[in-house]
Protein backbone atom coordinates (compact mmCIF):
# COMPACT_ATOMS: atom_id res chain seq x y z
CA UNK A 1 0.00 0.00 0.00
CA UNK A 2 1.15 3.55 -0.75
CA UNK A 3 1.59 6.17 1.96
CA UNK A 4 -1.53 7.91 0.66
CA UNK A 5 -3.55 4.71 1.09
CA UNK A 6 -2.23 4.24 4.62
CA UNK A 7 -3.10 7.84 5.55
CA UNK A 8 -6.60 7.42 4.13
CA UNK A 9 -7.17 4.12 5.93
CA UNK A 10 -5.90 5.60 9.18
CA UNK A 11 -8.25 8.57 8.84
CA UNK A 12 -11.19 6.27 8.05
CA UNK A 13 -10.34 4.09 11.03
CA UNK A 14 -10.25 7.08 13.41
CA UNK A 15 -13.52 8.39 11.97
CA UNK A 16 -15.19 5.00 12.42
CA UNK A 17 -13.78 4.57 15.92
CA UNK A 18 -15.02 7.94 17.14
CA UNK A 19 -18.38 7.47 15.40
CA UNK A 20 -18.76 4.16 17.21
CA UNK A 21 -18.06 5.97 20.47
CA UNK A 22 -20.93 8.37 19.81
CA UNK A 23 -23.34 5.59 18.84
CA UNK A 24 -22.47 3.16 21.64
CA UNK A 25 -22.07 5.91 24.21
CA UNK A 26 -23.84 9.22 23.68
CA UNK A 27 -26.77 7.99 21.55
CA UNK A 28 -27.10 4.69 23.43
CA UNK A 29 -27.44 6.41 26.81
CA UNK A 30 -30.02 8.86 25.48
CA UNK A 31 -32.05 5.97 24.04
CA UNK A 32 -31.71 3.97 27.28
CA UNK A 33 -33.07 6.86 29.35
CA UNK A 34 -36.17 7.08 27.14
CA UNK A 35 -36.84 3.60 25.72
CA UNK A 36 -35.00 1.27 28.10
CA UNK A 37 -31.97 -0.95 27.75
CA UNK A 38 -33.71 -3.57 25.63
CA UNK A 39 -34.29 -1.08 22.82
CA UNK A 40 -30.74 0.21 23.27
CA UNK A 41 -29.15 -3.22 22.90
CA UNK A 42 -31.31 -3.94 19.86
CA UNK A 43 -30.11 -0.69 18.28
CA UNK A 44 -26.46 -1.51 18.99
CA UNK A 45 -26.95 -5.08 17.72
CA UNK A 46 -28.38 -3.71 14.46
CA UNK A 47 -25.36 -1.44 13.97
CA UNK A 48 -23.01 -4.33 14.73
CA UNK A 49 -24.89 -6.48 12.21
CA UNK A 50 -24.26 -3.83 9.56
CA UNK A 51 -20.55 -3.92 10.43
CA UNK A 52 -20.49 -7.71 10.15
CA UNK A 53 -22.19 -7.60 6.75
CA UNK A 54 -19.69 -5.00 5.58
CA UNK A 55 -16.78 -7.16 6.74
CA UNK A 56 -18.18 -10.19 4.90
CA UNK A 57 -18.79 -8.47 1.56
CA UNK A 58 -15.61 -6.34 1.60
CA UNK A 59 -13.05 -7.59 -0.95
CA UNK A 60 -9.74 -9.01 0.24
CA UNK A 61 -6.81 -6.60 -0.26
CA UNK A 62 -4.29 -7.57 -2.87
CA UNK A 63 -1.09 -8.84 -1.24
CA UNK A 64 2.31 -8.19 -2.71
CA UNK A 65 3.72 -11.29 -1.01
CA UNK A 66 3.38 -14.83 -2.20
CA UNK A 67 2.21 -17.49 0.27
CA UNK A 68 5.70 -18.99 0.42
CA UNK A 69 7.57 -15.71 0.85
CA UNK A 70 10.65 -15.90 3.10
CA UNK A 71 10.37 -14.67 6.65
CA UNK A 72 12.95 -13.67 9.26
CA UNK A 73 13.15 -16.24 12.08
CA UNK A 74 15.54 -17.38 14.81
CA UNK A 75 14.33 -20.99 14.68
CA UNK A 76 16.77 -22.27 12.06
CA UNK A 77 19.80 -21.19 14.15
CA UNK A 78 18.76 -23.35 17.12
CA UNK A 79 18.99 -27.14 17.42
CA UNK A 80 15.73 -29.01 17.87
CA UNK A 81 16.80 -30.17 21.36
CA UNK A 82 16.76 -26.50 22.41
CA UNK A 83 13.80 -25.04 20.52
CA UNK A 84 11.35 -27.83 21.37
CA UNK A 85 11.75 -27.60 25.19
CA UNK A 86 11.63 -23.80 24.98
CA UNK A 87 8.31 -23.79 23.15
CA UNK A 88 6.94 -26.51 25.43
CA UNK A 89 7.82 -24.63 28.63
CA UNK A 90 6.22 -21.38 27.47
CA UNK A 91 3.14 -23.09 26.04
CA UNK A 92 2.58 -24.92 29.35
CA UNK A 93 3.02 -21.64 31.23
CA UNK A 94 0.40 -19.91 29.10
CA UNK A 95 -1.95 -22.87 29.51
CA UNK A 96 -1.57 -22.77 33.30
CA UNK A 97 -2.24 -19.03 33.35
CA UNK A 98 -5.35 -19.48 31.22
CA UNK A 99 -6.63 -22.28 33.46
CA UNK A 100 -6.08 -20.16 36.58
CA UNK A 101 -8.18 -17.35 35.12
CA UNK A 102 -10.84 -19.77 33.85
CA UNK A 103 -11.18 -21.44 37.26
CA UNK A 104 -11.61 -18.06 38.95
CA UNK A 105 -14.27 -16.99 36.43
CA UNK A 106 -16.21 -20.26 36.75
CA UNK A 107 -16.10 -20.09 40.55
CA UNK A 108 -17.29 -16.48 40.45
CA UNK A 109 -20.24 -17.43 38.23
CA UNK A 110 -21.37 -20.70 39.77
CA UNK A 111 -20.00 -21.00 43.32
CA UNK A 112 -22.34 -20.38 46.27
CA UNK A 113 -19.52 -18.40 47.89
CA UNK A 114 -17.68 -16.57 45.06
CA UNK A 115 -13.93 -16.16 45.56
CA UNK A 116 -12.46 -12.80 46.51
CA UNK A 117 -11.21 -10.82 43.53
CA UNK A 118 -8.60 -9.08 45.66
CA UNK A 119 -7.29 -12.38 46.99
CA UNK A 120 -7.10 -13.75 43.45
CA UNK A 121 -5.07 -10.76 42.25
CA UNK A 122 -2.70 -10.89 45.22
CA UNK A 123 -2.15 -14.65 45.12
CA UNK A 124 -2.57 -15.72 41.49
CA UNK A 125 -1.97 -12.39 39.71
CA UNK A 126 1.84 -12.41 40.04
CA UNK A 127 1.93 -16.03 38.86
CA UNK A 128 -0.17 -15.21 35.78
CA UNK A 129 2.06 -12.27 34.85
CA UNK A 130 5.15 -14.38 35.48
CA UNK A 131 3.95 -17.33 33.41
CA UNK A 132 2.64 -15.28 30.47
CA UNK A 133 5.20 -12.45 30.34
CA UNK A 134 8.32 -13.09 32.40
CA UNK A 135 8.88 -16.74 31.47
CA UNK A 136 8.70 -16.10 27.67
CA UNK A 137 11.00 -13.08 28.06
CA UNK A 138 13.54 -14.99 30.17
CA UNK A 139 13.55 -18.00 27.84
CA UNK A 140 13.96 -15.67 24.84
CA UNK A 141 16.92 -13.97 26.51
CA UNK A 142 18.53 -17.36 27.21
CA UNK A 143 18.10 -18.41 23.58
CA UNK A 144 19.70 -15.17 22.37
CA UNK A 145 22.58 -14.75 24.81
CA UNK A 146 23.43 -18.31 25.85
CA UNK A 147 22.72 -20.20 22.64
CA UNK A 148 23.60 -17.34 20.28
CA UNK A 149 20.43 -17.51 18.20
CA UNK A 150 20.54 -15.43 15.01
CA UNK A 151 17.75 -14.34 12.69
CA UNK A 152 17.81 -15.83 9.19
CA UNK A 153 15.52 -15.80 6.19
CA UNK A 154 13.42 -18.96 6.24
CA UNK A 155 10.47 -20.03 4.08
CA UNK A 156 7.02 -19.37 5.50
CA UNK A 157 6.12 -22.95 4.56
CA UNK A 158 8.37 -25.98 4.49
CA UNK A 159 7.73 -28.95 2.22
CA UNK A 160 7.13 -32.39 3.76
CA UNK A 161 6.80 -30.89 7.22
CA UNK A 162 5.06 -33.02 9.85
CA UNK A 163 2.16 -31.63 11.87
CA UNK A 164 4.28 -31.55 15.04
CA UNK A 165 7.04 -29.65 13.24
CA UNK A 166 4.49 -27.19 11.83
CA UNK A 167 3.01 -26.55 15.29
CA UNK A 168 6.48 -26.05 16.76
CA UNK A 169 7.50 -23.63 14.01
CA UNK A 170 4.31 -21.58 14.20
CA UNK A 171 4.44 -21.34 18.00
CA UNK A 172 8.11 -20.37 17.90
CA UNK A 173 7.47 -17.66 15.33
CA UNK A 174 4.45 -16.32 17.18
CA UNK A 175 6.00 -16.34 20.66
CA UNK A 176 9.78 -16.20 20.43
CA UNK A 177 10.72 -14.45 17.19
CA UNK A 178 9.22 -11.05 18.18
CA UNK A 179 10.66 -11.20 21.72
CA UNK A 180 14.06 -12.47 20.61
CA UNK A 181 14.36 -9.74 18.00
CA UNK A 182 13.57 -7.08 20.63
CA UNK A 183 16.03 -8.57 23.11
CA UNK A 184 18.83 -9.04 20.57
CA UNK A 185 18.41 -5.44 19.35
CA UNK A 186 17.70 -3.60 22.61
CA UNK A 187 19.58 -5.85 25.05
CA UNK A 188 18.62 -4.83 28.63
CA UNK A 189 16.54 -2.00 27.17
CA UNK A 190 13.94 -4.63 26.30
CA UNK A 191 13.18 -4.92 30.03
CA UNK A 192 12.22 -1.24 30.12
CA UNK A 193 10.09 -1.64 27.00
CA UNK A 194 8.14 -4.53 28.52
CA UNK A 195 7.71 -2.73 31.86
CA UNK A 196 6.44 0.39 30.11
CA UNK A 197 4.02 -1.65 28.03
CA UNK A 198 2.71 -3.22 31.24
CA UNK A 199 2.35 -0.03 33.29
CA UNK A 200 1.87 3.02 31.05
CA UNK A 201 -1.88 2.65 30.57
CA UNK A 202 -2.62 1.11 33.96
CA UNK A 203 -5.01 3.87 35.03
CA UNK A 204 -6.94 3.71 31.73
CA UNK A 205 -7.29 -0.06 31.91
CA UNK A 206 -8.60 0.09 35.48
CA UNK A 207 -10.86 3.10 35.12
CA UNK A 208 -12.99 1.74 32.28
CA UNK A 209 -14.63 -0.88 34.50
CA UNK A 210 -15.57 1.61 37.23
CA UNK A 211 -16.64 4.64 35.19
CA UNK A 212 -20.37 3.96 34.96
CA UNK A 213 -20.75 2.77 38.58
CA UNK A 214 -18.97 5.95 39.70
CA UNK A 215 -21.06 8.25 37.52
CA UNK A 216 -24.44 6.56 38.05
CA UNK A 217 -24.20 4.93 41.48
CA UNK A 218 -25.00 6.37 44.88
CA UNK A 219 -22.65 4.39 47.15
CA UNK A 220 -19.00 4.59 48.19
CA UNK A 221 -18.71 8.23 47.10
CA UNK A 222 -20.34 7.74 43.67
CA UNK A 223 -21.97 10.75 42.03
CA UNK A 224 -25.55 9.62 41.34
CA UNK A 225 -25.90 11.21 37.90
CA UNK A 226 -28.53 10.26 35.33
CA UNK A 227 -27.97 8.52 32.00
CA UNK A 228 -28.49 11.83 30.20
CA UNK A 229 -25.83 13.46 32.37
CA UNK A 230 -23.31 10.77 31.49
CA UNK A 231 -24.26 10.86 27.81
CA UNK A 232 -23.60 14.60 27.62
CA UNK A 233 -20.51 14.78 29.83
CA UNK A 234 -18.75 11.53 28.96
CA UNK A 235 -19.96 10.44 25.56
CA UNK A 236 -20.19 13.87 23.95
CA UNK A 237 -17.70 16.17 25.68
CA UNK A 238 -15.49 13.20 26.51
CA UNK A 239 -15.22 12.02 22.91
CA UNK A 240 -14.54 15.57 21.71
CA UNK A 241 -11.84 15.90 24.37
CA UNK A 242 -10.25 12.60 23.32
CA UNK A 243 -10.01 13.84 19.74
CA UNK A 244 -8.48 17.13 20.91
CA UNK A 245 -6.03 15.31 23.17
CA UNK A 246 -4.97 13.03 20.32
CA UNK A 247 -4.49 16.03 18.03
CA UNK A 248 -2.48 17.87 20.68
CA UNK A 249 -0.28 14.83 21.24
CA UNK A 250 0.36 14.40 17.51
CA UNK A 251 1.29 18.07 17.08
CA UNK A 252 3.63 18.07 20.07
CA UNK A 253 5.35 14.89 18.89
CA UNK A 254 6.09 16.65 15.61
CA UNK A 255 7.37 19.74 17.45
CA UNK A 256 9.09 18.39 20.58
CA UNK A 257 9.81 14.77 19.73
CA UNK A 258 8.48 11.44 20.91
CA UNK A 259 10.04 10.98 24.35
CA UNK A 260 9.15 14.38 25.87
CA UNK A 261 5.52 13.81 24.89
CA UNK A 262 5.69 10.24 26.18
CA UNK A 263 6.96 11.50 29.54
CA UNK A 264 4.33 14.24 29.82
CA UNK A 265 1.60 11.79 28.78
CA UNK A 266 2.44 9.58 31.74
CA UNK A 267 2.23 12.56 34.10
CA UNK A 268 -1.12 13.88 32.90
CA UNK A 269 -2.68 10.41 32.75
CA UNK A 270 -1.78 9.87 36.40
CA UNK A 271 -2.62 13.42 37.52
CA UNK A 272 -6.21 13.35 36.27
CA UNK A 273 -6.93 10.71 38.91
CA UNK A 274 -6.59 13.53 41.44
CA UNK A 275 -9.52 15.31 39.76
CA UNK A 276 -11.70 12.25 40.23
CA UNK A 277 -10.49 11.91 43.83
CA UNK A 278 -11.56 15.50 44.48
CA UNK A 279 -14.89 14.82 42.79
CA UNK A 280 -15.48 11.81 45.04
CA UNK A 281 -14.52 13.84 48.13
CA UNK A 282 -16.92 16.73 47.48
CA UNK A 283 -15.21 18.69 44.67
CA UNK A 284 -13.72 21.46 46.84
CA UNK A 285 -10.80 22.03 44.48
CA UNK A 286 -12.99 21.78 41.37
CA UNK A 287 -15.44 24.33 42.76
CA UNK A 288 -12.54 26.69 43.39
CA UNK A 289 -11.28 26.20 39.84
CA UNK A 290 -14.74 26.82 38.37
CA UNK A 291 -15.02 30.01 40.41
CA UNK A 292 -11.57 31.35 39.49
CA UNK A 293 -11.83 30.41 35.81
CA UNK A 294 -15.43 31.69 35.52
CA UNK A 295 -16.36 28.45 33.75
CA UNK A 296 -18.99 27.63 36.34
CA UNK A 297 -21.83 29.89 35.10
CA UNK A 298 -21.71 28.92 31.38
CA UNK A 299 -21.34 25.21 32.13
CA UNK A 300 -24.12 25.37 34.71
CA UNK A 301 -26.36 27.15 32.21
CA UNK A 302 -25.64 24.45 29.62
CA UNK A 303 -26.44 21.75 32.17
CA UNK A 304 -29.69 23.46 33.17
CA UNK A 305 -30.74 23.62 29.52
CA UNK A 306 -29.91 19.93 29.01
CA UNK A 307 -31.84 19.06 32.18
CA UNK A 308 -35.03 20.35 30.58
CA UNK A 309 -34.70 17.65 27.91
CA UNK A 310 -34.20 14.86 30.44
CA UNK A 311 -37.11 12.61 31.45
CA UNK A 312 -35.60 12.30 34.96
CA UNK A 313 -36.15 14.57 37.94
CA UNK A 314 -33.01 16.65 38.48
CA UNK A 315 -31.50 17.98 41.68
CA UNK A 316 -31.60 21.65 42.62
CA UNK A 317 -27.81 21.92 42.26
CA UNK A 318 -27.80 20.08 38.92
CA UNK A 319 -25.96 22.86 37.11
CA UNK A 320 -23.03 22.93 39.53
CA UNK A 321 -22.80 19.13 39.68
CA UNK A 322 -22.75 18.84 35.90
CA UNK A 323 -20.16 21.62 35.61
CA UNK A 324 -17.85 19.63 37.90
CA UNK A 325 -18.43 16.43 35.94
CA UNK A 326 -17.88 18.02 32.53
CA UNK A 327 -14.63 19.70 33.56
CA UNK A 328 -13.29 16.49 35.11
CA UNK A 329 -14.24 14.27 32.18
CA UNK A 330 -12.98 16.80 29.65
CA UNK A 331 -9.59 16.99 31.39
CA UNK A 332 -9.36 13.22 31.81
CA UNK A 333 -10.15 12.56 28.16
CA UNK A 334 -7.74 15.22 26.96
CA UNK A 335 -5.06 13.44 28.99
CA UNK A 336 -6.24 10.02 27.80
CA UNK A 337 -6.12 10.98 24.13
CA UNK A 338 -2.72 12.59 24.64
CA UNK A 339 -1.33 9.52 26.41
CA UNK A 340 -2.83 7.16 23.82
CA UNK A 341 -1.02 8.94 21.00
CA UNK A 342 2.17 8.94 23.07
CA UNK A 343 2.15 5.21 23.83
CA UNK A 344 1.15 4.37 20.24
CA UNK A 345 4.03 6.42 18.86
CA UNK A 346 6.44 4.89 21.38
CA UNK A 347 5.44 1.28 20.70
CA UNK A 348 5.56 1.92 16.95
CA UNK A 349 9.10 3.28 17.32
CA UNK A 350 10.49 0.25 19.16
CA UNK A 351 9.12 -2.47 16.87
CA UNK A 352 11.07 -3.84 13.93
CA UNK A 353 9.23 -3.36 10.60
CA UNK A 354 9.94 -7.03 9.80
CA UNK A 355 8.05 -8.04 12.97
CA UNK A 356 5.83 -4.99 13.27
CA UNK A 357 2.44 -6.72 13.34
CA UNK A 358 3.32 -9.34 15.94
CA UNK A 359 5.54 -7.13 18.10
CA UNK A 360 3.03 -4.29 18.20
CA UNK A 361 0.16 -6.68 18.94
CA UNK A 362 2.20 -8.27 21.74
CA UNK A 363 3.19 -4.96 23.34
CA UNK A 364 -0.26 -3.41 22.89
CA UNK A 365 -1.92 -6.39 24.57
CA UNK A 366 0.44 -6.05 27.53
CA UNK A 367 -0.73 -2.45 28.08
CA UNK A 368 -4.06 -3.74 29.42
CA UNK A 369 -2.84 -6.80 31.36
CA UNK A 370 -1.91 -5.28 34.73
CA UNK A 371 -4.93 -3.00 34.78
CA UNK A 372 -7.29 -5.86 33.98
CA UNK A 373 -5.81 -8.04 36.72
CA UNK A 374 -6.01 -5.14 39.18
CA UNK A 375 -9.73 -4.48 38.78
CA UNK A 376 -11.02 -7.06 41.30
CA UNK A 377 -8.59 -5.83 43.96
CA UNK A 378 -9.53 -2.19 43.43
CA UNK A 379 -13.21 -3.12 43.33
CA UNK A 380 -12.92 -4.51 46.84
CA UNK A 381 -11.19 -1.34 48.00
CA UNK A 382 -14.07 0.70 46.57
CA UNK A 383 -16.54 -1.32 48.63
CA UNK A 384 -14.49 -1.03 51.81
CA UNK A 385 -12.94 2.45 51.57
CA UNK A 386 -14.70 4.27 48.73
CA UNK A 387 -13.77 5.71 45.35
CA UNK A 388 -11.55 8.44 46.80
CA UNK A 389 -9.02 5.91 48.10
CA UNK A 390 -8.94 4.06 44.78
CA UNK A 391 -8.28 7.24 42.81
CA UNK A 392 -5.39 8.11 45.12
CA UNK A 393 -3.96 4.60 44.69
CA UNK A 394 -4.19 4.78 40.90
CA UNK A 395 -2.52 8.20 40.97
CA UNK A 396 0.51 6.83 42.80
CA UNK A 397 0.61 3.69 40.67
CA UNK A 398 0.59 5.92 37.59
CA UNK A 399 3.83 7.39 38.88
CA UNK A 400 5.56 4.08 38.15
CA UNK A 401 5.13 4.66 34.42
CA UNK A 402 6.44 8.22 34.80
CA UNK A 403 9.65 6.97 36.44
CA UNK A 404 10.06 4.25 33.80
CA UNK A 405 9.54 6.78 30.99
CA UNK A 406 12.38 8.89 32.41
CA UNK A 407 14.67 5.86 32.45
CA UNK A 408 13.69 4.99 28.88
CA UNK A 409 14.28 8.59 27.78
CA UNK A 410 17.78 8.44 29.28
CA UNK A 411 18.45 5.06 27.66
CA UNK A 412 17.47 6.29 24.22
CA UNK A 413 19.53 9.45 24.65
CA UNK A 414 22.60 7.38 25.53
CA UNK A 415 22.07 5.02 22.59
CA UNK A 416 21.92 7.92 20.13
CA UNK A 417 24.89 9.81 21.62
Where do the model's predicted regions map?
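Short amphipathic helix-loop junctions that connect adjacent transmembrane helices
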Residues: 110-122, 196, 200, 209-231
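C-terminal ends and interior cores of transmembrane alpha-helices
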Residues: 267-317
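Small-residue (Gly/Pro/Ala) motifs that create kinks and tight helix-helix packing interfaces
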Residues: 20-32, 212, 249, 374-382
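Intracellular loop-helix junctions on the cytosolic face of multi-pass helical membrane proteins
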Residues: 2-196, 405-417
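Intracellular juxtamembrane helix-capping segments at the cytosolic ends
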Residues: 1, 337-352
Amino acid sequence: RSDEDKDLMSALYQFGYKSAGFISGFIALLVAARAGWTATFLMVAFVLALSMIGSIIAPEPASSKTPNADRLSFLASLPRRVSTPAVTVVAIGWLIGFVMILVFVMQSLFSATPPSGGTFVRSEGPWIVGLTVLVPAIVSAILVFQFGAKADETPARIANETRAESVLRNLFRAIFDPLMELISRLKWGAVLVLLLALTYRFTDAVWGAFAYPFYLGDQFGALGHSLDDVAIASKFFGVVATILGSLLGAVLIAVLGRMPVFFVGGIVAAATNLLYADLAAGATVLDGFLHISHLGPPLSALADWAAKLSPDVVAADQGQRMARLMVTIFAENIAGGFALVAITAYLTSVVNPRFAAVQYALLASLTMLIGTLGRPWLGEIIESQGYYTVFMITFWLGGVAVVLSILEWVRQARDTS
